[in-house]
Amino acid sequence: MALTKADIAEHLFTQLGMSKREAKDMVEAFFEEIRQALERGEQVKISGFGNFDLREKNQRPGRNPKTGEDIPISARRVVTFRPGQKLKARVENVEPNE
């Protein structure tokens, strides 16, 4: 099962006593800040969690899997995530399906 933005908003509602609307708006605002920073080309560092970085990928040769035709894969910018040490340590110590 995946954790969704709606799940996070529900946790804020139940644990912090926010209204559902406030909780939803806070979650949306949080992710919008991350989106905007990445659009500006900035790195996003969340202490104890990890870093979101932008990486430039060069054009490279590719192949259409159906036809086998050679096609170029265009250059693009991609978002990468590198988990921090604290997150890695916590995930390593969790049993599957906990």
Curated annotation (Swiss-Prot):
Pfam families in UniProt: Bac_DNA_binding
One biological process term in Gene Ontology: DNA recombination
Origin: domain of life: Bacteria
Coiled coil start-end: none
Keyword Transcription among UniProt keywords: yes
Keywords: DNA recombination, DNA-binding, Transcription, Transcription regulation, Translation regulation
InterPro entries membership: Hist_DNA-bd, Histone-like_DNA-bd_CS, IHF-like_DNA-bd_dom_sf, IHF_alpha
One GO MF term attached to the UniProt entry: structural constituent of chromatin
Record flagged with keyword Cell division: no
GO cellular component, one term: cytosol
Annotated segments matching region Disordered: 52-73
Transmembrane segments annotated in the record for this chain: none
Assembly: Heterodimer of an alpha and a beta chain.
Function of the protein: This protein is one of the two subunits of integration host factor, a specific DNA-binding protein that functions in genetic recombination as well as in transcriptional and translational control.
Similarity-based family: Belongs to the bacterial histone-like protein family.
Stated name of the protein: Integration host factor subunit alpha
Lineage, opening ranks: Bacteria, Pseudomonadati, Pseudomonadota, Gammaproteobacteria, Aeromonadales
